[in-house]
C-alpha cells in the first residue's frame, strides 16, 4: 500500500489485482492489545504513504494508530514545489478512519479481496 500511495501521489494511475491466492498469504490481524502508537504525519507524499503503511503494520501487531495531523498545511495553502494548493488533512483523516473501521471489523480474522480493494480506494480518495 506504501507504493500505491507514492504512485498516486505522483500522479500515476495504478491498477492492481486482489486475487485470493495472494491475500491468503497475509497474516491474520492480531487481537487488539490496547496499545496505541502516536504518529505525526509529515506534510509530503512520503509522510502520507508512511501513515497508511504504519496503520496496517500496527494492526497486524494489535496496535491502534493515533494520528497527529498538525504538520499538514491547511486546505488552500500554496504548494510551492508542485503548484496548486494543499488539500488539508481532512481527506487523509477520513481515509484513516475508514481504514480503521475495516481493521476493527477484521480483528483476529483475515482480510478478503473486498477489504483490500476498499483500503486501496480509501487511500486513492485521500490522495
What are these regions (language model features)?
Residues 1-127:
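Extended catalytic cores of very large enzyme megasubunits
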Amino acid at each position: 500500500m506504501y507504493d500505491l500511495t507514492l504512485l498516486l501521489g505522483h500522479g500515476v494511475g495504478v491498477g492492481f489485482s486482489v486475487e485470493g491466492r495472494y491475500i491468503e498469504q497475509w497474516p491474520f490481524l492480531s487481537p487488539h492489545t490496547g496499545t496505541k502508537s502516536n504518529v505525526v504525519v509529515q506534510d509530503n507524499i512520503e509522510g502520507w504513504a508512511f501513515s497508511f503503511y504504519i496503520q496496517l503494520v500496527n494492526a497486524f501487531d494489535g496496535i491502534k494508530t493515533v494520528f497527529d495531523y498538525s504538520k499538514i498545511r491547511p486546505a488552500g495553502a500554496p504548494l510551492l514545489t508542485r503548484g496548486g494548493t494543499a488539500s488539508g488533512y481532512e481527506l487523509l483523516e477520513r481515509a484513516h478512519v475508514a481504514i480503521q473501521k475495516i481493521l476493527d471489523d477484521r480483528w483476529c480474522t483475515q482480510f478478503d479481496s473486498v477489504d483490500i480493494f476498499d483500503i486501496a480506494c480509501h487511500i486513492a480518495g485521500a490522495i
